[in-house]
């Protein structure tokens, strides 16, 4: 989903990266599954988002660097389980997992503030919708 073009020049991941950088997040790791070459070309070194730096910045976590290649199709929770050893070595206090399937700007500062305020172990951001079945 991240590499799907939007308005010819952009990709879906651009919304997420711009929102994160706009909120002061300066270390972003992108987990990729398959057919990610065009995404890597698009992201480059992260310069477009001021993420080209020695400390922090943008890094791409390809499937061959993840624990079990065959199980990456399972979803977000399984992806988190696959990279848990890497996450445990991080110095950051909080981890945000976000998908690239929505074209919107998101205020991650409000999410983090609510997370800290409630002293939660996990915080989810979602939109409640009424689904009507015909």
Question: What is each residue range found by the language model?
Answer:
Residues 1-134:
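Unchanged
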């Amino acid at each position: 989903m991240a590499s799907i073009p939007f308005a010819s020049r952009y990709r879906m991941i651009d919304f997420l990266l711009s929102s994160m950088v706009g909120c002061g997040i300066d270390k972003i790791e992108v987990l990729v599954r398959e057919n990610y070459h065009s995404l890597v070309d698009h992201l480059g070194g992260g310069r477009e988002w001021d993420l080209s730096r020695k400390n922090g910045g943008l890094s791409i976590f390809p499937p061959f660097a993840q624990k079990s290649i065959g199980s990456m199709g399972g979803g977000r929770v399984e992806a988190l389980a696959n990279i848990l050893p890497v996450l445990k070595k991080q110095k950051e206090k909080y981890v945000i997992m976000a998908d690239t399937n929505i074209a919107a700007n998101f205020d991650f500062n409000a999410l983090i503030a609510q997370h800290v305020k409630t002293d939660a172990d996990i915080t989810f951001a979602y939109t409640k919708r009424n689904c009507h079945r015909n």
